[in-house]
C-alpha cells in the first residue's frame, strides 16, 4: 500500500516529489505529505489527495534540494492531518515516511513513553521514528547506525526513508517486505515504491532487497545489510516508456488499460509462440521442465483478480496437461499448515509482484522444498526475485486500481504454460495443440472486435446504474470470469455483486431473484451450453433481468435475454480472454455514471503490501 518518494540532488525537490506522489497515488490516497530540508526540517501534510496537499503548500516556502513525500493508505489510525506522513520524532530533529506495518508497535510505544517520548498520532510509523531517535540518543551513534539497529527491534513490514535536520545532504532508507527502488541520475538520486516516479529522470535503478539499508550522502550511494555488510549495488536498466504511465487522452487509466489489451495480450505471448512454425517456448518452464512434467500437483497461490486467473489455469492445466491443480488464497494458504513436498510446484501470481500474502505463501512453500514459479508483471519485483523461475506477463504498467489487462495477460501466460505442459507430457494431441496455437494468435484481433461493443455496453449500463445488487453466473471456463466480473463491479461502483457457478444458483442465490435483480450470464457456445440455457430459463421464470454474453451468431439465448452482448467465437479453453472484456466495460461505465472515482476506488490500493 502507500507510496513513498524521495529526492536528493541539484534540482528543486518539491516538484519532483509531488509529481512522483501523483504517479503513486494508486497505492493510497487517504492523505499526503512532504518533508523538505530548507533552513530546517519542515513537514507539510493534509488529509485527502495529493491535489489537496498541493493547494495547502501553494503559499509556503518549499524550496530545497532534498525532500521526501508519502501518499497514504491508512492502517493504524484514521485518515486525517495528524496521522498523515511524514512523522517527526519527539524532538522534531528527524522525520520518517513509512510503507508497511510494524506489528510490535504497541509494546515499543509503551517502552518509549516510559522513556519520555511523546506521540502526536495513532500510527505505528511514529513509533518507528521515535525508536530510531531513542537508539541514536542512547547509543551516541550516527543516524544511519541508529536506523540499522532499529531494524533489529521492529517486527513487520517496512519501506522507510529518514531525514535529519542535522544533515542537509543525507537520505537514509531501508526495506523489508515493502518495495523500494533507487534511481541513479547525474549527481542526483531518487527513491520510490516503484519505478513510475523515476523514469522521467533516469533509466538506471537499483532494486533494494529485504533487510538492506541505503545511505545516500554527499552524492554517494552505499548499501549495507542489517548485519552491516557492505553490498555492491546491482544497477538495472528500466525498459519502461514515460507515455505508458500517462492517460494518453483517455478519461481514466482503467479505460485506457481495457483498450490496451489487444497489445498486452500480444506482448505476453510475443517470442513464446509462433503457430506457423509450431514454436512454443518459455524460459522459466524450460529451465525446470523435468520438475513440471513430473509434478505430482501444481498449487497456485494468489489474491483477488490474480486468484481468478489461477482458477482459469486450473481448468486449463488439468484439461490439457492432466496435472492436478489446487488454487489457494495466499492469505489462507500460509496459515493452514499445508502439506507440501519436493514433487509439488507452487505457482504464485501477482500483478505487482509485491503482494504481501503471496510472498509469505512463497516463503512457506520454499521452506517445505517445493519448486516456486512466479508470474508477475513488474520486473525486479520481490516475487520475481524470490522464485526459482518464472514468467513476466509484459502487460506494461497498470495504474488503475481495478486490474483489467493484468488479468488477460496472466490468463495468456497461463494458457501458454498449459499448452507447453500438455505437449511435453503427451496429453495434448499435436493437431489440437496447433489449433489452440492458431486460435491464441487470433485472440488480440478478437479482443479488438469485442472492444467495439463499448457503445452498446454504455446503453446497457445506463439502465442498470442504479441497481443495488448484481448476480453473475458462468459455467466451466466462464465461472472464474463470473467471479471476476462481479469483483470489478463491486470494486469500482460499490454495488453489491456476487459471482456463482450457474448450477449453484438453485442452491441459494435463486431466492434473491426478482424483477429488480440484474443477472449477468456468460453463456458462450461450449460443452455446458445446454445447461446454462436451462439456468437462464430458471432466472426468467422468476422475472430476473438477463444480460447475456453470448457467442456471435447465437439465436437461442437472444430470444430469452433482456440484453445480449455478442463476442467472437473462440476455443472453449480461451474464451475467458474474450468474455471478460464486456464485463470490464460494464463495470467501468456503471461506475462512471454513478460518479465514482474509477481509478482510485474508496478503501482500495493497487499493491497490497501489508497483511
Which ranges hold each PLM region?
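Conserved short alpha-helical segments that host acidic/polar catalytic motifs at enzyme active sites
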Residues: 1-247, 251, 260-296, 335, ...
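Glycine-rich oxoanion-binding loops at beta->alpha junctions
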Residues: 65, 69-82, 276-289, 313-349, ...
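Structural motif
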Residues: 66, 94, 297-299, 345, ...
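Acidic/histidine-rich
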Residues: 154-188, 460, 465-491, 526, ...
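Glycine-rich, anion-gripping cofactor-binding loops and their flanking helix/strand elements
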Residues: 181-206, 331-365, 504-540, 570-584, ...
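Generic C-terminus detector
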Residues: 228, 545, 558-560, 570-611
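Active-site phosphate/pyrophosphate-binding segments
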Residues: 261-265, 269-299, 389-518, 591-611
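Glycine-rich phosphate-binding loops that contact phosphosugars or nucleotide phosphates
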Residues: 293-434, 439-442, 522-563, 586
Amino acid at each position: 500500500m502507500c507510496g513513498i518518494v524521495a529526492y536528493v540532488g541539484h534540482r528543486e525537490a518539491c516538484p519532483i516529489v509531488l509529481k512522483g506522489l501523483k504517479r503513486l497515488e494508486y497505492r493510497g490516497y487517504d492523505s499526503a505529505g512532504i518533508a523538505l530540508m530548507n533552513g530546517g526540517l519542515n513537514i507539510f501534510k493534509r488529509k485527502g489527495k495529493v491535489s489537496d496537499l498541493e493547494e495547502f503548500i501553494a503559499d509556503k516556502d518549499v524550496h530545497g534540494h532534498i525532500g521526501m513525500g508519502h501518499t497514504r493508505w491508512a492502517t493504524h489510525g484514521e485518515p486525517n492531518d495528524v496521522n498523515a506522513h511524514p512523522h517527526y520524532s519527539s524532538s522534531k530533529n528527524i522525520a520518517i515516511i513509512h510503507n508497511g506495518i510494524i506489528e510490535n508497535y504497541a509494546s515499543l510505544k509503551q517502552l518509549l513513553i516510559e522513556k519520555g517520548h511523546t506521540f502526536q498520532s495513532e500510527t505505528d510509523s511514529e513509533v518507528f521514528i521515535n525508536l530510531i531517535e531513542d537508539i541514536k540518543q542512547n547509543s551516541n551513534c550516527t543516524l544511519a547506525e541508529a536506523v540499522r539497529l532499529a531494524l533489529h527491534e521492529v517486527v513487520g513490514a517496512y519501506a522507510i526513508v529518514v531525514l535529519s535536520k542535522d544533515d542537509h545532504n543525507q537520505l537514509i532508507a531501508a526495506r523489508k517486505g515493502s518495495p523500494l527502488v533507487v534511481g541513479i541520475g547525474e549527481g542526483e538520486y531518487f527513491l520510490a515504491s516503484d519505478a513510475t516516479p523515476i523514469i522521467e529522470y533516469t533509466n538506471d535503478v537499483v532494486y533494494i532487497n529485504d533487510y538492506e539499508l541505503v545511505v545516500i550522502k554527499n552524492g554517494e550511494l552505499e548499501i549495507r545489510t542489517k548485519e552491516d555488510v557492505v553490498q555492491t549495488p546491482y544497477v538495472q536498466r528500466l525498459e519502461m516508456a514515460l507515455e505508458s504511465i500517462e492517460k494518453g487522452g483517455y478519461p481514466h487509466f482503467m479505460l485506457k488499460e481495457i483498450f490496451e489489451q489487444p497489445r498486452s495480450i500480444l506482448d505476453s505471448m510475443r517470442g513464446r509462440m509462433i503457430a506457423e512454425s509450431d514454436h512454443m517456448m518459455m524460459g522459466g518452464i524450460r529451465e525446470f521442465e523435468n520438475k513440471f512434467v513430473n509434478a505430482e500437483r501444481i498449487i497456485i497461490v494468489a489474491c483477488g483478480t490474480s486468484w481468478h486467473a489461477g482458477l482459469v489455469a486450473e481448468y486449463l492445466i488439468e484439461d490439457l496437461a492432466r496435472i492436478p491443480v489446487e488454487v489457494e488464497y495466499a492469505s489462507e494458504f500460509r496459515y493452514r499448515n499445508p502439506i507440501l513436498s519436493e514433487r509439488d510446484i507452487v505457482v504464485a501470481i501477482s500483478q505487482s509482484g509485491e503482494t504481501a500474502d503471496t510472498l509469505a505463501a512463497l516463503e512457506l512453500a520454499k521452506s517445505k522444498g517445493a519448486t516456486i514459479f512466479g508470474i508477475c508483471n513488474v520486473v525486479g519485483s520481490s516475487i520475481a526475485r524470490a522464485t526459482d523461475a518464472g514468467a513476466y506477463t509484459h502487460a506494461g504498467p497498470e495504474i488503475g486500481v481495478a486490474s483489467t489487462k493484468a488479468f488477460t495477460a496472466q490468463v495468456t501466460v497461463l494458457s501458454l504454460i498449459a499448452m507447453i505442459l500438455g505437449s511435453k507430457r503427451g496429453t495434448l494431441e499435436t493437431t489440437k495443440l496447433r489449433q489452440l496455437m492458431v486460435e491464441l494468435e487470433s485472440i488480440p484481433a478478437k479482443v479488438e472486435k469485442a472492444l467495439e461493443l463499448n457503445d452498446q455496453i454504455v446503453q446497457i449500463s445506463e439502465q442498470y446504474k442504479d441497481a443495488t445488487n448484481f448476480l453473475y453466473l458462468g459455467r466451466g471456463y466462464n465461472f472464474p470470469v463470473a467471479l471476476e466480473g462481479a469483483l470489478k463491479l463491486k470494486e469500482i461502483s460499490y454495488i453489491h455483486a456476487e459471482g456463482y457457478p450457474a448450477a449453484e444458483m438453485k442452491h441459494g442465490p435463486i431466492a434473491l431473484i426478482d424483477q429488480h435483480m440484474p443477472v449477468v450470464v456468460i453463456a458462450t457456445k461450449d460443452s455446458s451450453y445446454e445447461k446454462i440455457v436451462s439456468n437462464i430459463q430458471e432466472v426468467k421464470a422468476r422475472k430476473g433481468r438477463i444480460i447475456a454474453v453470448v457467442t456471435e451468431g447465437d439465436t437461442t439465448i437472444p430470444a430469452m435475454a433482456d440484453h445480449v452482448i455478442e463476442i467472437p467465437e473462440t476455443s472453449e479453453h480461451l474464451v475467458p480472454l474474450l468474455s471478460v472484456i464486456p464485463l470490464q466495460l460494464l463495470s467501468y461505465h456503471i461506475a462512471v455514471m454513478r460518479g465514482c472515482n474509477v481509478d482510485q476506488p474508496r478503501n482500495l490500493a493497487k499493491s497490497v503490501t501489508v497483511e
